[in-house]
Amino acid sequence: MSEEPTPVSGNDKQLLNKAWEITQKKTFTAWCNSHLRKLGSSIEQIDTDFTDGIKLAQLLEVISNDPVFKVNKTPKLRIHNIQNVGLCLKHIESHGVKLVGIGAEELVDKNLKMTLGMIWTIILRFAIQDISIEELSAKEALLLWCQRKTEGYDRVKVGNFHTSFQDGLAFCALIHKHRPDLINFDSLNKDDKAGNLQLAFDIAEKELDIPKMLDVSDMLDVVRPDERSVMTYVAQYYHHFSASRKAETAGKQVGKVLDTFMLLEQTKSDYLKRANELVQWINDKQASLESRDFGDSIESVQSFMNAHKEYKKTEKPPKGQEVSELEAIYNSLQTKLRLIKREPFVAPAGLTPNEIDSTWSALEKAEQEHAEALRIELKRQKKIAVLLQKYNRILKKLENWATTKSVYLGSNETGDSITAVQAKLKNLEAFDGECQSLEGQSNSDLLSILAQLTELNYNGVPELTERKDTFFAQQWTGVKSSAETYKNTLLAELERLQKIEDSLVEFAKRAAQLNVWIEAADDHVFDPINVDSVQGVQEIQEKFDAFLHDQSQQFAELEALAALTQQLRELGRSENDYSVISYDELSAKWNNLLAGIEERKVQLANELTTQTNNDVLCQSFSVKANEISDYVRVTLDAISQNTSSDPQEQLNNIRAIITAHAEKKPELDELYTIASQLEEAQVVDNKHTQHSLESIKLKWDKLNTLAKKNEQVVEGEILAKQLTGVTAEELSEFKACFSHFDKDNDNKLNRLEFSSCLKSIGDELTEEQLNQVISKIDTDGNGTISFEEFIDYMVSSRKGTDSVESTKAAFKVMAEDKDFITEAQIRAAISDSKQIDYLLASMPAVEGGFDYNSFAEKLYQ
């Protein structure tokens, strides 16, 4: 579309204004030189340096990329100059610009007003029209661009191209918006207009390569700065930052690709770190569980049991959760790699989920064996404690007996009558019988206990043996020696003694023996029942039955003593000085023993019932736990095999698994009920299974967690495929721009409005490209673009493609079409410092910069 003709009549107030004329001359001269310098040329006086047409032709060739033909390079005469300038004016008109009132003669005659009018027309066509289609639309689009970029800046409100820029803040805001590293806007003195203008002009010239087309005086020494000069200068900002935006867009595309690969690499690194730490913990814990050094006391073993219980309650569950989370991370990583068509992640040996599960199973086996070893050791220590108590009780009783007898035997009293001497001899005979009975029974019991302690690997057996042997060798032998001495003394005095009351002696002897048996029998009747199985109860029952058989034989001895007592009473001897116990006392002990026997029978029956019931519960727990464990294992296999290439099919499969898992919950509740019954029964070990409630619950939760995380990953991947790649901020920007150019609010843009809208947001299309876009998105063919069609175009044009070609293309834009990219270009296009560091560390260095092509190839291998 052609430019509107530029009036050059004397009514043009802007050209008549001398100050504006001076400003335009300066600005237009700088603009021309910004292009002529590409050819190594320049002008100094805009009204004289174009009079021969040579530099004017150079300017037109640079800005239009189209040569001006047949220009006389060595004009000699005025007619030659007019011909050259005429060719230039025709060249301008050939690009769709109508020149009204501007002739070659006026330019050759150095008419400043005509020259400035011509240059303004050129600026409109080649510098500002590419922002829109015609002057009004171009001005509006450029103004909208300034307003959007300076929105939110303190005391900056752009409403025109003259007074709105007079304080310099708008220029500073435009620079800060795009290059915040160049200006600290908050530190500016908002009232220092000259300082702000000078700062903006200097930075634009030095850092942005925008020539200084205006001076501070051009903006401040007039009430209203020249609009054309300001527009020309602002257009330089637009074109500079538009080029930067392309590089930034390419940088964002590269950034998205890098985010994906960096996240995958970080996920791999995190998995390996956590997996290594977990496997190390499992190995260390398994080594400690394989130790069997539990100490040599019940308290020590119970301390180990408490520590093991606390470990299973507090230390192990988080590690079990870590197993589940690592498997979820591993499967999620594989799913993401598969969905983006990358090679699967291969973990080092020993760190795959299956290998970790195997290591975990070995740990649980070690736990089971550790718990069993503790149970056996506690049982052993309890047996040792009972045997030691019994051993000490027997030996203490012997020591007390020996001490008592030593006092008696050491008196050496013979009595004052034959009866008394005979009584002492009889008493000594009773002592001898009791001594032999005690020695035989006690020594047998002590040896039996020592044998049992030896079998239990009790390390104190030598000390106990030495104590026993020392007692019998010293104190016991001393008592026997004293008895023998005392007996000889009595016999020496007994020549006149006669046998007195053999029956009393017989009673004393037999009663003492029976009394010893009754006291020894207490151990079979009153010892506590300490078992944890049906077999244990049966073993005690067998020993008890053997004892009952012996008891029936001892009962015959009691009846014989009863008959002997009756005979003594009939003879008038109710007292028996030779006996240590009376029949009534012996009978009372016997009756007490009988009561204990009956109670023992009840205890054994109850214990058998209890252990039988506990065993039934253990078997029920084992069956249910095995069922749930098998179900979890099969379901986990199903999840790991859910590898369909269709994400929706994967999602349907995993959701079906989650639903079925929820329906299985009552079976877990049933297991909890059985476990509660076992806990109430104080059953801590189950020989029918190695599963515990905690291990089943851990497997159950692991399945639940893995399924849900798998669901989340697949849902996320489906959603990722549906995303457009356009941010909410960009969508809001598209809507605001569309509404601005939709003047009649009919939710449609005509061709001119659509083109202006695209250019206001930085999309510059040629006429051919614009025609192709409209024919593609105007689906109803009505010649207008609806908001929905506009958004579809913006989304499709900004949706990144994840391929090696698209990534290379993005890098090429950032590198300004070179085959290598510099660090400065990377930092100019990408703002994320982590992404910048990653690129600088990963890209191969080449002469002049970095090889982005080989880097992109490596990314997609």
Swiss-Prot record:
Main location: cytoplasm
Subunit structure: Homodimer; antiparallel.
Compartments it resides in: Cytoplasm; Cytoplasm, Cell cortex; Contractile vacuole; Cytoplasmic vesicle, Phagosome
Cross-referenced InterPro entries: Actinin_actin-bd_CS, CH_dom, CH_dom_sf, EF-hand-dom_pair, EF-hand_Ca_insen, EF_Hand_1_Ca_BS, EF_hand_dom, Spectrin/alpha-actinin
An MF annotation (GO) of this entry: calcium ion binding
Protein's name according to its UniProt entry: Alpha-actinin A
Lineage: Eukaryota, Amoebozoa, Evosea, Eumycetozoa, Dictyostelia
GO biological process: actin crosslink formation; actin cytoskeleton organization; actin filament bundle assembly; cell motility; cellular response to starvation; hyperosmotic response; phagocytosis; sorocarp development
Swiss-Prot/TrEMBL Spectrin repeat ranges: 240-365, 366-480, 481-601, 602-714
Residues in EF-hand domain copies: 729-764, 765-800
Domain Calponin-homology (CH): 22-127, 136-242
Disruption phenotype: Cells show a minor impairment of growth under conditions of reduced temperature and hyperosmotic stress. Fruiting body development and spore production on soil plates is strongly impaired in mutants lacking abpA, but is only mildly affected in mutants on agar plates. Double mutants lacking both abpA and abpC show a marked reduction in growth, cell size and resistance to osmotic shock, and decreased motility and phagocytosis rates. Development is blocked at the tip stage of aggregation, although expression of developmentally regulated genes does not appear to be affected.
Similarity field: Belongs to the alpha-actinin family.
UniProt keyword annotations, A-Z: Actin-binding, Calcium, Cytoplasm, Cytoplasmic vesicle, Developmental protein, Metal-binding, Repeat, Vacuole
PANTHER family cross-referenced by the UniProt entry: SPECTRIN/FILAMIN RELATED CYTOSKELETAL PROTEIN
GO cellular component: actin filament; cell cortex; cell leading edge; cell projection; contractile vacuole; cortical actin cytoskeleton; cytosol; extracellular matrix
Binding residues for Ca(2+) 2: D778, D780, N782, T784, E789
Disulfide bonds: none
Outcome of swapping D744A: Abolishes cross-linking activity and reduces calcium binding by 55%
Function description: F-actin cross-linking protein which is thought to anchor actin to a variety of intracellular structures. This is a bundling protein. Increases the actin-stimulated ATPase activity of myosin. Involved in vegetative cell growth, phagocytosis, motility and development, probably through stabilization of the actin network in the cortical cytoskeleton.
Reported effect, E789A: Decreases sensitivity to inhibition by calcium
Stretches for region Actin-binding: 1-239
Superkingdom of source: Eukaryota
Binding residues for Ca(2+) 1: D742, D744, D746, K748, E753
